[in-house]
Amino acid sequence: MADYEDIDYNKPMSFKVWKKIIPFILPQKKTLIKCTLLMFSVALVDVFLPILLGYTIKNNIVPRSAEGIGLILTVIFVLVIVQGINVRYFVDLGIRAETGVSRAIRNAVFLRLQKLGIFYYNKTPVGYMMARTNSDTSRIGDLVAWGVIDFSWSVFYCIGAIIAMFFVHWRLAFIVCATILPLALLTWFFQKRILFVNRILRKINSKMTGAMNEGITGARTVKTLVAEKQCSEEYSEITAEYRSYAKKMAKLKSVFIPTVMFVGTAATALTIGSSSMVDLAILAIFLQYAASFFEPVHNIANILTEFAATQANVERVSGLLQQEPGITEKNEVLEKYGDTFSPKKENWEPLLGDIEFKGVTFKYPDGKENVLENFNLHVERGTYAAIVGETGAGKSTLVNLVCRFFEPDAGEILIDGRDYRERSQLWLHSNLGYVLQNPHLFSGSIRENIRYGRLDASDEEVENAAKIVHADKVIAKLKNGYDTESGEGGDLLSTGEKQLISFARAILANPQIFILDEATSSVDTETEMLLQKAISRLLEGRTSFVIAHRLSTIRNADIILVVHDGKIIERGTHTELMKKSGVYFDLYTRQFEEEAEEKVLGEKQKA
């Protein structure tokens, strides 16, 4: 399991950090204001109840009088009804605010992920991105909504209780209020330590989510490698680390909360110790306030601690939202061509398919050495170009640059005679068909997956695309035909079925540039024969780059490029290269012998 080093977020409690998510909170402003007003009403009732109790003791219990008791009971009944209504509405509003904030942040995170380049996905574990999208956004929404509610009630109650205590007996009020300063100092002391531990827990949680995701998605590989024990031990190490820091967090809170309770108990004891100077009614009022006063004070302390702890989540989410895409368009390009979510297709020129590399030098963002150096290549419109070479020779790099998943560090890549950076990435991708060795299908039906090639395509066009690549007969054998569910990632279909569907999807887009990245290497012989019948028709009139694993499949290519260490060492047709008896000749004959040997062994096993 890959060990991804997350960024350390060790900033102290800072409004600047929280300011970054204010745009997501502002749409819930009215809801949060309503919550605050309701909390004022709730706090007002809570402050009034001890005074009502003191009045009852003084006028009814001590003199043993029933005079006015009916009115008191009526007032209590009304207050209970009011509190019930308040609670019903603030719970409703709190849930609205929480889900509203979480949804806004979650959508923004997902949108940012859609805009980020391939390199970000290559270096960032899925678990990290999942944690940002789910757990972090949920925690922020929860704190914003319920934090405002709890904090509002606590502040209003504290202010109201202090005013009421000074109004009833100012000396006792001073005694109770004297414990606030020690409580504030304790809160400051503990919240720094809790914040530090929580940040570590957030990082470990991301690693844990990533490891779990890797274990599930790679289940088949794990089982075939008999690596269950190794994966379990690695996951156990991560959970042990999480448990260790969770225990530290529990210890901090187990000291902090009882300490706060002790301060509250001390205030109650001081009140009782001073009872000789007051009557029973006033003592009852102050005992009520002393006992309940420290609940809101503790709430405030707890909310501040939670804000400090959740700042790590805010930092991570805002860090992702500030990630820059690997490819950044110039302003003039955006003005003319639009962006992914607001394309200006009326300004798009037709793409013809002439592609030229001129003095291109390139290294990957995390690489130290150039993969390509002063690389030159011209592929004319409609050319079927096959790329072959050993692993690591630079085949996929050429394709990545053609697709503009990355851009050259020096030199330029021309499409139809112009540097492709002068036009938008979306313009290029809309004219591009890309079929991978391991195609990805989305959850949904086969029909829906093919339609991703062109979302406005009719059912007839979807089915015609399937016929072109000979996928229609395979789909017809499935129980529900085109309405068959593909499953997550296409897991309910065979590799060959997924490959055929991905071909149909690419054809439906009617691209002018076609990329086949070892697209037939993972299919069985029968499916490969179907695909080979379709490929020549698919590539006709289109500029095509085919990274080939089986060299026998590219004999009809217009030009074959043999790549080694980022340089083209041979080029020509199959016949021309075989006559040269060079690198391509060696690769082809070696592979031919291996395939022939496998065929003989297979026939012997059948016999």
Regions found by a protein language model. Give the residues of each.
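Short intracellular "coupling" helices and adjacent cytoplasmic loop segments at the cytosolic face
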Residues: 2-11, 99, 107-131, 135-137, ...
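Helix-loop-helix
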Residues: 62-74, 164-178, 248-316, 320-324
